[in-house]
Amino acid sequence: MYAIVRSGGRQHKVAVGDIVEVDKISTGKVGDTVELSTLLVVDGDAVTSDPWVLAGIKVQAEIVDHHKGQKIDILRYKNKTGYRRRQGHRQQYTAIKVTEIPAAAK
């Protein structure tokens, strides 16, 4: 059984026990439980994609860690003028462990 969930404007394929890296969830602390909205649930041959049914299904996950991603460099350069600008960025992520995917009601 697996589900497609939405978090931070992105979609992730998750199963029970998976550890997934999502954009930072600022409201939670390590050990807290979060609910993720579900877009699709696949249980064997049964595929549930009806939004009315999925509105009642929330995937449960536990926050494992908050951390920063790899550093990226942003460089702007204009030829022959000496114009150079450098900027760095490190995205903040939250690692979550999926604990429960409720089955869709038949």
Curated annotation (Swiss-Prot):
Coiled-coil positions: none
One GO cellular component, as annotated: ribosome
Intrachain disulfide bonds: none
InterPro entries hit by this protein: bL21-like (IPR028909), bL21-like_sf (IPR036164), Ribosomal_bL21 (IPR001787), Ribosomal_bL21_CS (IPR018258)
Keywords: Ribonucleoprotein, Ribosomal protein, RNA-binding, rRNA-binding
SUPFAM superfamilies per record: L21p-like
Top-level taxon of the source organism: Bacteria
Cited HAMAP family: Ribosomal_bL21 (MF_01363)
Function text: This protein binds to 23S rRNA in the presence of protein L20.
Subunit structure: Part of the 50S ribosomal subunit. Contacts protein L20.
UniProt family annotation: Belongs to the bacterial ribosomal protein bL21 family.
UniProt protein name: Large ribosomal subunit protein bL21
Organism: Streptomyces coelicolor (strain ATCC BAA-471 / A3(2) / M145)
